[in-house]
Curated annotation (Swiss-Prot):
Cell compartment(s), UniProt: Cell outer membrane
Chain's gene name: mltF
Job description of the protein: Murein-degrading enzyme that degrades murein glycan strands and insoluble, high-molecular weight murein sacculi, with the concomitant formation of a 1,6-anhydromuramoyl product. Lytic transglycosylases (LTs) play an integral role in the metabolism of the peptidoglycan (PG) sacculus. Their lytic action creates space within the PG sacculus to allow for its expansion as well as for the insertion of various structures such as secretion systems and flagella.
UniProt source species: Salmonella choleraesuis (strain SC-B67)
One term of GO molecular function: peptidoglycan lytic transglycosylase activity
Name this protein carries in UniProt: Membrane-bound lytic murein transglycosylase F
Keywords: Cell outer membrane, Cell wall biogenesis/degradation, Lyase, Membrane, Signal
PANTHER family: MEMBRANE-BOUND LYTIC MUREIN TRANSGLYCOSYLASE F
An annotated GO cellular component: cell outer membrane
Gene3D superfamilies hit by this protein: 1.10.530.10, Periplasmic binding protein-like II (3.40.190.10)
Amino acid sequence: MKKLKINYLFIGILTLLLAAALWPSIPWFGKTENHIAAIQARGVLRVSTIDSPLTYSVINGKKYGLDYELAQQFANYLGVKLKVTVRQNISQLFDDLDNGNADLLAAGLVYDSARVKNYQPGPMYYSVSQQLVYRVGQYRPRSLATVNENQLTIAPGHVVVNDLQRLKETKFPDLSWKVDDKKGSTTLLEEVISGKLDYTIADSVAISLFQRVHPELAVALDVTDEQPVTWFSRLDDDNTLSAALLDFFNSINEDGSLARIEEKYLGHGDDFDYVDTRSFLRAVDNVLPELEPLFKKYAKEIDWRLLAAISYQESHWDPLATSSTGVRGLMMLTKNTAQSLGLTDRTDAEQSISGGARYLEDMMAKVPETVPEDERIWFALAAYNMGYAHMLDARSLTVKTKGNPDSWTDVKQRLPLLSQKPYYSKLTYGYARGHEAYAYVENIRKYQISLVGYLQEKEKQEAEAMKLAQDYPAVSPEELNKTPFPLLSFLSQSSGYLTHSPSLLFTPQKKEEK
């Protein structure tokens, strides 16, 4: 998979052009009636988005998402509350702008020449490419020349339709596709996984995140080059909202908060390993249930799923794991560390998890207070892996090379240098396997993303199954076996977890309400 590129030079040029266009209207309150005045009078910033791990999602009652966090900061910047409306597809998002039901669209939408004819783009803050995906084990197209409408389905309003039309006119005259007006990109990705669809197209970041939970999804080819991502608002003579957005993005770029949010959601890397991810998810099904109560019990200061991800990276959840250097157990503790924590048996699952959690808490407590709260864990994990002293060296090296020692984005880039003599020879604590610490933290982040998404998916499907049980009467085994897709066959699909709504497979008459 192509690596994600945040092309700040390109984004900067586009932002400058936007600034030039907006310059006459920078004084926000120069008019008696403008968008900013209306938003502040209302006291609410209305943002429409799409439910996805990157843009906006709700997990255990808490809201997450790159676009959500940026929108919340922008609302704070304006001194108003944030109201988020979730839509099913991109067409519905732009309907909200057209109908006056939204002030902004914040949903990972790409800048496109056709869109900017009718809508006002904001500053560009990262970039993606559009990719055609298929299911592992099925035919992989090597070119769009062989793709037709019986195979390729696109979500309504998807910007790639314009690119496909240009490609059809210039390179692939037989290229064809269909648009499903009722489904969003996430649903179409799920249908590719289930085998209901052959292909669809989505952006590279969304695909990368989706693969952490659904490793059967594979990239066949890139349909476009990198495209900048932006927010959209209404296009009219009043540019006060666009001017405010430009000022806001400039401020969070200067104070580093934009980089921190991007690191949180985009900084885990996108080197996808199908075999490793599939093995991990199998372990989640087969091994984690026995250990889950212990992770929940001892993960006091951190998310238990992160503690579980650390343990998987350390030992693949094998309580008897032993390395060539003598570290042992689920959390791979050294003998000295175990003794300092009062542990008597490193191969005892409960002792190992409790000891590892306490040791990580010690590392967290040592991280300088100048490090932002949401990045402290990554510094602590690097220290957990290579020692706290070497983490201090990494911060020192970051300063010497004109980086920010409190930014995980900057520090992690220097970690591999700790094993190179021109650098470690000038550091206080000398040589360290910094490249291993870098990979260690990145792998844990990937496992955590997979685990959170996978468990959320299972909870969603369990809720659907419960609703199904309430809506339909019991189905006898004889009736069930008459269906083309028996329940047991359905439940065995996709590595033991559901990939689409159970309601698709049932046709019995719904119970009448009494």
